[in-house]
């Protein structure tokens, strides 16, 4: 039996019902105010002209599919990423690890114990980190069966035998492809003259519905994987997803030449970087010569004060970040880093807020405006969320498409403005209505 626990930003949604603590109240009564005045704010550093430009072209009200999904399919699997693309997420999110032979993986944990059968395949190495294995060795592991065991209601036979993805895989899935597999379901790969893994073969996904999401990438602390940011930049260049000259980035092809409902992959904001690491943020700023959307993540800021919070924001600004990623109060025991005074402080800088992790309608209502508007005046200033990480992209899309749109129909507009990037404020107003199961089927 695999452990279902993942820390902080990575807590699976199926634990939320037991640990989630949320009151049905307005921000006037909300403990998130924490006693601080929104005017009690230390000096905040100024954004550069380039940071402001990036913020202007980064879309607002975006749905970020956390690891594809943790709820409907095994996290960061091909099934999860294809589901997130087809359900209509604006971004599919992945974490980066690196193998012994330098392959960049889409995988959260440094340990393989939680989400693979490493204890069966490599019993003497089960406690080794991912970086101790070659990619060929990792391809022998099953990342799907544990999910079926832990989540019988979401279990599917097609999840059995799923393998660990690479960053290459995630980018290709975002472009409308799937991994090419043999009759036994094993991926078909290219090898060099010594038999070493070089790359994977892909084919057009017959279930591709035309959506072209962006990719939201998290790197770990530099001491875990030296040179990761440089390798990431090179990988994105190889695929045409990044270039110092934005005009030279690849045009992502559409299915049958017709754009889908999501087309973030064909914008300058096609890639967003994120990290909790101070050193990681510094390295991102160094390696990516052209500034791109970059998020500095925050969590578990116990006893935060305006001064200490401003210090983190200023570090982020000084090192190229264009957005802050605070956690909402979605798990008992982990204090939020998005109290109203904290959200107001971020707003004063002009940075975007991409918060994590939303898994219920009530959480969206609490942070996007409706529950912070006791006088029913409307206003985007009451919305502390430009982007929402979620394990339920289907629920998030429905919230924007129907709930916030419903408030707008009543004259209460809580949408953040997309006027500067030339997109509609409600990116999901016309997203087809499909259930998560329908997309999986």
Model-based region annotation:
Residues 27-441:
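Phosphate-group recognition and catalysis centered on beta-loop-alpha active-site segments
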Residues 22-26:
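C-terminal motif of bacterial Sec signal peptides marking the signal peptidase cleavage site
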């Amino acid at each position: 039996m695999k452990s279902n626990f993942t820390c902080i930003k990575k807590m699976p949604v199926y634990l939320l019902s037991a640990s989630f603590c949320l009151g049905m109240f307005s921000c006037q009564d909300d403990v998130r105010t924490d006693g601080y005045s929104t005017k009690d704010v230390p000096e905040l550093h100024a954004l550069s002209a380039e940071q402001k430009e990036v913020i202007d072209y980064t879309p607002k009200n975006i749905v970020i599919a956390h690891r594809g999904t943790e709820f409907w399919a095994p996290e960061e699997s091909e099934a999860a990423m294809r589901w997130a693309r087809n359900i209509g997420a604006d971004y599919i999110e992945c974490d980066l690890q690196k193998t012994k032979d330098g392959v960049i993986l889409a995988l959260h944990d440094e340990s393989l114990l939680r989400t693979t059968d490493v204890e069966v395949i490599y019993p003497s190495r089960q406690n080794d980190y991912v970086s101790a294995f070659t990619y060929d060795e990792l391809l022998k592991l099953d990342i799907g069966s544990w999910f079926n065991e832990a989540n019988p209601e979401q279990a599917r036979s097609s999840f059995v035998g799923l393998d660990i993805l690479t960053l290459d895989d995630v980018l290709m899935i975002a472009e409308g492809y799937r991994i090419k597999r043999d009759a036994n379901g094993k991926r078909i790969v290219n090898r060099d003259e010594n038999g070493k893994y070089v790359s994977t073969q892909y084919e057009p996904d017959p279930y591709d519905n035309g959506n072209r999401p962006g990719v939201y990438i998290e790197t770990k602390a530099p001491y875990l994987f030296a040179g990761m940011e440089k390798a990431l930049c090179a990988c994105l260049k190889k695929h045409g997803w990044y270039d110092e000259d934005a005009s030279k980035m690849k045009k992502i092809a559409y299915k049958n030449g017709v754009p889908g409902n999501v087309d973030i992959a064909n914008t300058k904001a096609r890639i967003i970087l994120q990290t909790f690491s101070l050193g990681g943020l510094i390295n991102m700023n160094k390696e990516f010569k052209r500034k791109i959307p970059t998020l500095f993540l925050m969590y578990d800021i116990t006893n935060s004060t305006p001064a200490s919070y401003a210090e983190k924001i200023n570090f982020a600004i000084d090192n190229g970040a264009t957005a802050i990623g605070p956690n909402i109060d979605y798990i008992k025991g982990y204090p939020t880093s998005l109290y109203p005074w904290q959200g107001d402080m971020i707003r004063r800088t002009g940075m975007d807020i991409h918060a994590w992790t939303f898994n219920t309608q009530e959480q969206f209502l609490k942070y996007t405006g409706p529950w912070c508007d006791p006088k029913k005046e409307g206003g985007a200033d009451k919305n502390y969320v430009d982007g929402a990480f979620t394990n339920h992209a289907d629920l998030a899309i429905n919230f924007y498409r129907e709930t916030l749109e419903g408030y707008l129909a009543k004259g209460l507009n809580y949408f953040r403005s997309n006027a500067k990037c030339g997109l509609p404020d409600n990116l999901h107003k016309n997203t087809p209505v499909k259930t998560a199961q329908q997309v999986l089927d």
